UniProtKB/Swiss-Prot annotation:
It comes from Geobacter metallireducens (strain ATCC 53774 / DSM 7210 / GS-15). It comes from the Bacteria. GO terms for cellular component: cytoplasm. This is Asparagine--tRNA ligase. Belongs to the class-II aminoacyl-tRNA synthetase family. One of its GO terms (molecular function) is ATP binding. Pfam families: tRNA-synt_2, tRNA_anti-codon. InterPro entries: Aa-tRNA-synt_II (IPR004364), aa-tRNA-synth_II (IPR006195), aa-tRNA-synth_II/BPL/LPL (IPR045864), Asn-tRNA-ligase (IPR004522), Asp/Asn-tRNA-synth_IIb (IPR002312), NA-bd_OB-fold (IPR012340), NA-bd_OB_tRNA (IPR004365).
């Protein structure tokens, strides 16, 4: 019995002229009196392997009755294909049905809307589009780890359950074992001291604060894990559960942070072009016509840097009308970000040094006492895709900022401790993994780049 090989390898010519065994799912089947053609896919690549079955096959009648979606094992000889569009095909000597699929199988040979496919998220990975999405997602995730490993960064697993709200927005999912029907009370309020963690706990919104602690011991670290936001936003860009990449560097300022972000983003763009060519060609042809050219441009670009103040002036001089106002002290909206990167710069740009009152308490206050050492990377078609900053390493200044924005220092005593002994300038950034995959594939809805999306009123599967 031949050992199984993956269809990706068979299509590369492995086993050519010899007997091989492949296993996979039938994408399509065409039958006639003299021959049956099965398009077989096992998820290892975008392309299908054509299986040719002839009447001399003992199970030919059974093969002709196979339905789309059935799982089969095929043993046969891999040969050069006379047909155009494929190099090799498999002439079957034996076809065994492993799992039947009848006409009720939802993924029949027709075009399905993304909205419909979300309703069958347990089956959509078998479709062309989502097979490509999740191969790219897997490959890029591996590239993230490789990038940081090659540069000596320590991979840190930060906690998923936490009692701190890094962003201070209060959009945390709560974790409790208290009986919601009869919680213990103290002076009319829920007594969380009697909860499992003896405090009000939730799912993390970021691993940054804990990452900073490790950077003060290992210099360069990164986190890559799930994060959660209880934000009731039903938009194509928001999900309640998503993955974040968050590097942190000790002895680094804002410019070092921007340099790492540029190197990292260009690396990932180059990786997906080099490693996922077949899937990227599909996205370019069927999802986003200019995708490959746009990603190629970013991979080969030097990123511009623009002060927030200059960005505001450029926007004020714009000849287009914006939906949202443009004034110093207001945050940039997506329409502003896209105008800057697409019309003003014509490529990726870092906007730096934002007003401190629109940014988080942990960002380093600049000498003007009006701005903080923050940066956002803006890219064409998307706008902001990376956000980062130099962190405030001066204890008195950090305590003052926490007081300004109303962050309780008691819950972050450990974070303040990191500034008491051996504090260093340090910086880092965050990149939402799903938004990265959206950018690299041209997919326009975050629900379509994560296996089982979690959004308001939807946590099925």
């Amino acid at each position: 019995m031949s050992a199984r090989i993956r269809i990706r390898n068979a299509l590369a010519g492995e086993g050519l002229g010899n007997e091989i065994m492949v296993k996979g799912w039938v994408r399509t089947i065409r039958t006639g009196k003299e021959v049956a053609f099965l398009a077989l896919n096992d998820g290892s690549c975008f392309a299908n392997l054509q299986v040719v079955a002839e009447p001399g096959l003992a199970t030919f009648a059974d093969v002709c009755a196979i339905g789309t979606g059935a799982a089969v094992a095929v043993r046969g000889r891999l040969v050069d294909s006379p047909a155009s569009g494929q190099c090799y095909e498999l002439h079957a000597d034996e076809v065994a049905v492993i799992g039947l699929a009848d006409e009720s199988y939802p993924l029949q040979k027709k075009r399905h809307s993304f909205e419909y496919l979300r309703s069958i998220a347990h089956l959509r990975p078998r479709s062309n589009t989502f097979g490509a999405v999740f191969r790219v997602r897997s490959s890029v995730a591996q590239a993230v780890h490789r990038f940081f490993a090659e540069r000596g960064f320590l991979y840190v697993h930060t906690p998923i359950i936490t009692t701190s709200d890094c962003e201070g927005a209060g959009e945390m999912f709560r974790v409790t074992t208290l009986d919601p029907a009869a919680p213990p009370l103290l002076e009319g309020e829920v007594d969380f001291s009697r909860d499992f963690f003896a405090a009000q706990a939730g799912l993390t919104v970021s691993g940054q604060l804990e990452g900073e602690l490790f950077a003060q011991a290992f210099s360069d670290i990164y986190t890559f894990g799930p994060t959660f936001r209880a934000e009731n936003s039903n938009t194509p860009r928001h999900a309640a559960e998503f993955w974040m990449i968050e590097p942190e560097m000790a002895f680094a300022d804002l410019m070092a942070d921007a340099a790492l972000a540029e190197e990292f983003f260009r690396y990932l763009c180059r990786h997906v072009l080099d490693a996922c060519g077949e899937d990227m060609a599909f996205f370019n042809d069927h999802i986003d016509k200019g995708l490959i050219a746009r990603v190629e441009q970013v991979a080969n670009s030097s990123f511009a840097i623009m002060e927030y103040g200059e960005a505001i002036e450029r926007l004020k001089k714009a000849t287009v009308t914006f939906e949202y106002p443009v004034e110093w002290g207001l945050d940039l909206q997506t329409e502003h970000e896209r105008y800057l990167t697409e019309q003003v710069v014509g490529g990726p740009v870092f906007v730096i040094n934002y007003p401190k009152h629109i940014k988080a308490f942990y960002m380093r206050v600049n000498d003007d006492n009006k701005t903080v050492a923050a940066m956002d990377l803006l890219v064409p078609k998307v706008g902001e895709i990376i956000g980062g900053s130099q962190r405030e390493e001066r204890l008195p200044v950090l305590e003052g900022r926490m007081a300004e924005v109303g962050v309780n220092p008691e819950g972050l005593w450990w974070y303040l401790d990191s500034r008491r002994w051996g504090s260093t300038p340090h910086a880092g950034f965050g990149l939402g993994f799903e938004r990265l995959i959206m950018y690299l594939t041209g997919m326009e809805n975050i629900r379509d780049v994560i296996p089982f999306p979690r959004t308001p009123r939807h946590a099925e599967f």
